[in-house]
Amino acid sequence: MTSLTIEQKRVDIYPSAKPGSPVIYLNTFSNAVNSVYKNLMALGCPDFCLVAVSELKWDHDMTPWYMGPISKHDTPCTGGADDYLKLLLDEIMPEAEALLPGAPAWRGLAGYSLAGLFALYALYQTDVFARAASMSGSFWFEGIMEYVCSHEMKRKPDCLYFSLGDKESSTDNPILNVVQQNTPVSYTHLRAHETL
């Protein structure tokens, strides 16, 4: 594993021993990276490279536009996803891929919560990612359903994975508890438009 710092972001690169393996870009917390990688290895996943980006400003880097605080003690989401995506595409990916054993077979983008929202949003901004995974994606985010239903992805992904935990809809916060209905609606809309 090699670690870099690019624009205050920590980039951990886990190369595959096999040249030309796929590369997965995972936006995550720094304390989760090693356990994610170890669990994937324990599952016996096919050869792949993992590039984990952490030290993110979650409410800025992972959100597509401004949204006010969702609770009294929360901070607003400030809509820096486009700037972060540019950093990912123009600086992080070239530096990370220069350290890999050959060009990737394909690229995937994955994330949990707001990073899951970002993974889906990024598909509407760039055609670089062939696959994406949105784990417990923040599909409660104001305006995201309207955006998904009124825009087209830059390319049809080979695979798009959604997951949703069993506790997301049990919150008393009316903003957050719509994730239970919005995640399947996103899936159904994308499937109807032959995106999946």
Place the predicted regions along the sequence by residue.
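Alpha-helical scaffolding within the catalytic cores
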Residues: 117-118, 142-152
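Gly/Ala-rich beta-loop-alpha elbow adjacent to hydrolase catalytic centers
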Residues: 111-115
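Short glycine-enriched nucleophile-adjacent loop
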Residues: 116-125
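Single conserved hydrophobic/aromatic residue that forms the stacking wall/gate
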Residues: 189-196
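Catalytic His-Asp charge-relay segment
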Residues: 158-165
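Active-site nucleophile loop of the alpha/beta-hydrolase fold
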Residues: 133-140, 167
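A domain-start/cap signature at the N-terminus of enzymes
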Residues: 1-22, 48
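Serine-hydrolase catalytic machinery in alpha/beta-hydrolase-like enzymes
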Residues: 20-99
